UniProtKB/Swiss-Prot annotation:
Gene Ontology MF terms in the entry: nuclease activity; RNA binding
EC primary class: hydrolase
Organism: Helicobacter pylori (strain ATCC 700392 / 26695)
Family recorded in the similarity comment: Belongs to the VapD ribonuclease family.
Protein name (database record): Endoribonuclease VapD homolog
Length: 95
């Protein structure tokens, strides 16, 4: 499974008069339309159709379609996830 994670510079967004809520909403909508599911924050997990090439291509298209992403992104990474383990049961054990 592949994932994309990124960090947007909120100062840059503000300086460019970009509405924070709208840009994050637009990014989420775009990612969901391209085979990714929002996980948390700025982390999106790809579905079974996503491989390394489609992951990179998706980020490139995102940068073209949402220019504020390209201008204000501080860090963007593609991750390959070998396992996706939910640790919530471990937290509940100690409560």
């Amino acid at each position: 499974m592949y994932a994309v994670t990124f960090d947007l510079d909120t100062n840059c967004l503000n300086e460019n008069a970009v509405n924070l809520s709208k840009v994050y909403s637009d990014i989420r909508k775009f990612m969901e339309q391209h085979g990714f599911k929002w996980q948390q924050g700025s982390v999106y997990f790809g579905d079974e159709t996503i491989n390394a090439v489609t992951c990179v291509a998706t980020v490139q298209i995102l940068a073209k379609q949402i220019p504020s992403f390209a201008v204000c992104v501080k860090d963007v990474r593609m991750l390959k996830i070998e396992e996706n383990n939910d640790l919530m049961p471990a937290i509940k054990i100690v409560l």
